[in-house]
């Protein structure tokens, strides 16, 4: 069965969620809850370097979190997407919309 591991870290001006595994309709609920909560209080960075795949459920969380960030004056960042994660993001046509970074030092 697919799993999604989430590790949380906090920086001065961001919350980092390191994700590993598969983001799918079977695994996304904990990620969704954390993303929707944390974007209300701080900038949110999701590290996708260890993500094996993302389905439409996961992409929907990205879009909603991005929009919530705009509404609250916070920024949603995607950091180091794996090839599989980047392909899924590219498939949406919103690649240029997301803030894709390589390091948390790029968080403003």
Q: Model regions: which residues?
A:
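STAS-like cytosolic regulatory interaction modules
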Residues: 1-52, 66-108
